[in-house]
Amino acid sequence: MHFTQREQDKLMLVIAADLARRRQQRGLKLNYPEAVAIISFELLEGARDGKTVAELMSYGKQILGEDDVMEGVADMLTEMEIEATFPDGTKLITVHHPIV
């Protein structure tokens, strides 16, 4: 089985998000890469589930809160952009201040 670079990147994101969720379930606060992985994964899955870009921009702010991340992470993550595949093509999802 051969994967394109984009497919490999998506698989790595799934693995990173899974590891971050496991750490979160153990009561650990998430660091910057873990928070980005979880939010990115949830946005990509939302697109796959048929949500609109507008719905995902709003949903992106509900995935994690300041209590879920280490001190300073919310301040560092002021904007996220991720390209997702929708039924009508690939679109950019931008979430401003994803951790509130």
UniProtKB/Swiss-Prot annotation:
Pathway: Nitrogen metabolism; urea degradation; CO(2) and NH(3) from urea (urease route): step 1/1. Pfam families: Urease_gamma. It is found in: Cytoplasm. NCBIfam families: PRK13241.1 (NF009712), urease_gam (TIGR00193). CDD domains: Urease_gamma (cd00390). It catalyses: urea + 2 H2O + H(+) = hydrogencarbonate + 2 NH4(+). Keywords: Cytoplasm, Hydrolase. The keyword Iron does not apply. This is Urease subunit gamma. One of its GO terms (biological process) is urea catabolic process.
